């Protein structure tokens, strides 16, 4: 048993955002893709065998939570306190009688994990009065929110200010944000600061955050420093967690579910140059690798059950790869770039063997999980065109003018399209770039007419087909994808790189 460091994990919160999303488990028990949230916390503290876990005495899942604690750390000390909504520092205060006042102490929130050196943390813990584990630079969860704790330091790297739920500047990536791991030279120092925090009501929205416990310490002249961690995994909201699970499944090489043979055509558009990624890579976009697979192969998995499968390409390297590794996909190659996405689709369709079957036209830069192409085909019974869309794509919400959007009614019929202009409707869906047409004839006709009518003053996208079909009173419906990712912008490239580096470092799937 390690008696040199105290680890305290408050777990008394309700996790209301998860409850609202329909999660039935209490937050520490929610699965993340690499185990429960609590397991993700404890993996960072391998040397601490007897953490102090604070739980609510009245939570209906208390028994299950206690079982999970003991499963992970048989020698853990479980402290039950009355339910409250006063934040983690208040929970620690309620458990103060269980703390050794002279031991170095770590308070760790229960809804995140990361990668850092435990040995370095333990060494640094006793070299100053307080130690905040922080992260800096690009982090994907910042696309959704900036509501985290941030620190400000002087020229000697001493923390001078701590602020909850907001950065100090307009560029949070250049600041150090708190991960949720808080160290104190002794529990005595910590509890003294918490007492002042409670007495002076140093809180945010009536919650006593442990980040704010350092404010009395700083005022009293105690030394607080930070330790930057290598990677940070945020699970504090359902969207953050679901992003992490999405990437964990890619890392684990999970594929889309198998589906029965689909009597349709599948066409992947992979002739683009990917110029928007020029600052990050000179690799043609379809040849970018994500967890060991070429980007377009994720789309190839989707159309694997289609009767006829084709890919429209322009690169000799791509053609050789397709022939060698995907012999069942017909390659349709050209020697130069097309002028637009719509023109690529038109040329690709013209090069395919004519038939009366439906056709799925897929972008080569989408990664879509847990979708059966047969489910999309089924919707063609009541539609002439199906547009693949999603609702919770963080980068689209952050840069709405970079995406096209549609309004969808209660019957999943598309009623309006907003082309690269954002949407005034918060309930709108962003377009993924995949389209399913009732027949090849319909696809060739509407795409050809959109190009000839030049409805766009710039590049003609397949997105423009939606407006054309609506004006012609064709039935246009939405196929809603719950989780997807695209690599078409610098932000998306950075996100993909971050997660690949993270899971490689985790070593969970190697």
Question: What label would you give each PLM region?
Answer:
Residues 23-28, 282-286:
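Short alpha-helical oligomerization interface
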Residues 13, 111, 136, 237, ...:
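Active-site glycine-centered loops adjacent to acidic/histidine catalytic or metal-binding residues
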Residues 1-10, 17-19, 31, 35-107, ...:
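Conserved N-terminal catalytic core of the sugar/cofactor nucleotidyltransferase
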Residues 29, 151-153, 226, 287, ...:
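A structural signal for short hydrophobic beta-strand segments in well-ordered beta-sheet cores
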Residues 2-7, 101, 175-266, 428-510:
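Conserved alpha/beta core of the MobA/IspD/sugar-nucleotide pyrophosphorylase nucleotidyltransferase superfamily
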């Amino acid at each position: 048993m390690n008696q040199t460091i105290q680890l305290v994990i408050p777990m008394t919160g309700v996790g209301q955002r998860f409850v609202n999303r329909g999660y039935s488990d209490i937050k520490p028990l929610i699965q993340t893709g690499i185990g429960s949230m609590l397991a993700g916390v404890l993996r960072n503290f391998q040397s601490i065998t007897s953490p102090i876990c604070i739980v609510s005495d009245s939570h209906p899942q208390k028994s299950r939570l206690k079982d999970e604690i003991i499963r992970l750390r048989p020698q853990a000390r479980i402290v039950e306190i009355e339910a409250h909504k006063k934040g983690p520092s208040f929970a620690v205060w309620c458990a103060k009688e269980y703390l050794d006042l002279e031991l170095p102490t770590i308070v760790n929130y229960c809804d995140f994990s990361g990668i850092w050196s435990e040995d370095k943390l333990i060494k640094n813990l006793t070299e100053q009065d307080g130690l905040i584990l922080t992260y800096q630079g690009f982090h994907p969860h910042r696309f959704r929110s900036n509501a985290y704790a941030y620190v400000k330091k002087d020229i000697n790297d001493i923390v001078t200010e701590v602020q909850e739920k907001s950065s100090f500047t307009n560029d949070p990536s250049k600041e150090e944000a708190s991960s949720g791991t808080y160290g104190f030279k002794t529990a005595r120092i910590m509890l003294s600061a918490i007492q002042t925090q409670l007495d002076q009501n140093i809180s945010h929205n009536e919650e006593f955050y442990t980040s704010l416990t350092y404010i009395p310490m700083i005022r009293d002249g105690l030394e607080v420093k930070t330790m930057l961690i290598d990677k940070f995994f945020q699970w504090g909201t359902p969207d953050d967690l679901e992003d992490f699970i999405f990437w964990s499944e890619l890392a684990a090489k999970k594929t889309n579910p198998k589906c029965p043979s689909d009597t349709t055509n599948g066409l992947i558009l992979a002739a683009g140059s990917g110029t928007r990624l020029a600052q990050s890579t000179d690799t043609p976009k379809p040849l970018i690798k994500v967890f060991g697979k070429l980007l377009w192969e994720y789309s190839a998995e989707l159309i694997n059950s289609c009767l006829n499968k084709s890919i429209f390409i322009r690169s000799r390297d791509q053609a050789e790869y397709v022939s060698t590794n995907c012999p069942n996909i017909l390659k349709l190659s050209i020697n130069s770039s097309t002028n637009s996405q719509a023109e690529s689709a038109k040329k690709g369709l013209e090069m395919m063997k004519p038939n009366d079957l439906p056709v799925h036209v897929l972008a080569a830069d989408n990664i879509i999980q847990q979708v059966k192409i047969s489910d999309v085909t089924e919707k063609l019974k009541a539609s002439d065109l199906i547009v693949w869309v999603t609702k919770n794509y963080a980068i689209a919400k952050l840069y709405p003018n970079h995406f096209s959007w549609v309004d969808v009614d209660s019957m999943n019929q598309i009623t309006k399209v907003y082309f690269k202009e954002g949407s005034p409707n918060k309930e709108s869906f962003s377009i993924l770039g995949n389209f399913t047409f009732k027949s090849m004839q319909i696809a060739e006709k509407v795409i050809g007419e959109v190009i000839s009518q030049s409805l766009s003053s710039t590049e003609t996208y397949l997105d423009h087909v939606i407006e054309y079909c609506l004006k012609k009173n064709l039935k246009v419906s939405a196929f809603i994808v719950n989780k997807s990712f695209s690599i078409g912008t610098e932000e998306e490239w950075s996100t993909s790189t971050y997660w690949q580096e993270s899971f490689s470092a985790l070593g969970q799937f190697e």
